[in-house]
């Protein structure tokens, strides 16, 4: 917990202090006063009655003593409950397929006033230029968009081909940027545990900031060693006792509920009055359809309250104050004097019904955000340009030879989880012994001219057709799954033609596709348009079989070697438990 770095983020001049204090004392006129409001007390529980007084970006006072205070403008909350703006403790905005500007437009009106973002998706594709663009977006955003400096680009050295490197020298150039809060998820946990100097150099360089972790399922001495290296949190926990042990050992626990990785139900029972300061909420990866139809952090709070009976003040605490304290953002997370006026007014606190949002002391208007989106995106100078350096493919590129009677490794998908299982399947002249086996291939897209890496996939639910995408964590090569080589080739060629994107093929034809012109990861369309296109893609994908709820996000993690158990990268089949490549055929 890095309270010592608060000065980096809390910029207030002496003049601003004097003006704020004058309003607090009652000697000057406030900019805004919110009347007819109850403030949820995140520290003691219960509510505080009375107005909220705002001067500039900050709260000057709270409580009944300001009932008659003067203000330039008054906001009638109409009996609403006020809570601090919501904070997402860990996410990759690129996974929403929205630009940071569009993401803000989609989520700020839902109360998400702050995000802690790791832009390692775009950094894996285009290196420092991608990070620089995210920093430009953060500088101009109304939303508080903070960045963790991507630590593992690529995710695991020597295991995949990606588009760029991000050296320690480049990382250090961003360390003191005002929007940078620390070092992003250290995914190479075996390297940290074994004391690899290159990784310890990165940890040492950012040790005065927040050091993010990534250690799914880790326990025992290995977990102790990982924490001893200075890692402060983890968002990858998926089992109750795993989360409990991490809390016991001093880690902060990020409870994740994304579009593919859904860990809230497993971990929510851990949250209580005692440990809630060490618990945070995050989405990691959430697509625009879910944001539009279900929400973002607001959806997670709602579920904590309605499904897990978490007390109101605790649910909102883990959605704001706990995260602010963890990242040293001491000007955020509470509705109290001197704190930044990031305020969410709720007409129903139990249902998390957002009535109005203020950020940095100013009311947010959703229509204004939408109207300004195009100009603000252009102002950020997005890094356009085709990042697909791959020639079209043919069905013969996916040809695999199988021997009857032999056993082959199959990546077994677990719906709504990022981990996979490794299982075997026996081939005969009639095919494999289980009819859920389909084909998967990964094609590097950065000009290395490698042949496709091919494998077998089970449990995905694909009965016909093919799905292809350039969103494929973390190197973002082209991943394709299918029942026939011909349809796999058709899907791959469509995303190559689009300059990156998503595609569904069935009955020998492209049924739906979505171009992603920025790094093959993001669209420049509006959030509403993007949600509609995702809806069409999902509808087309559902015609291919009983797929996961979010088939493209689930598919995107089948190439990430730092999450067990069996994955496929552009280099081949990777055992995520042994951290070594393995063979498709079992050798006795």
Curated annotation (Swiss-Prot):
Q: Which UniProt keywords apply?
A: Hydrolase, Manganese
GO BP terms? adenine catabolic process
User: Which catalytic reaction applies to this protein?
Assistant: adenine + H2O + H(+) = hypoxanthine + NH4(+)
Q: Which family does it belong to?
A: Belongs to the metallo-dependent hydrolases superfamily. Adenine deaminase family.
Taxonomic superkingdom = Bacteria
The Swiss-Prot or TrEMBL record annotates one GO molecular function as: adenine deaminase activity
What this protein needs as a cofactor is:
Mn(2+)
| Disulfide-bonded cysteines | none
This enzyme's EC code(s): 3.5.4.2
What top-tier enzyme class does this entry carry?
hydrolase
What is the designated name of this protein?
Answer: Adenine deaminase
Q: Which Gene3D superfamilies match?
A: Metal-dependent hydrolases, Urease, subunit C, domain 1
Quaternary organization? Homodimer.
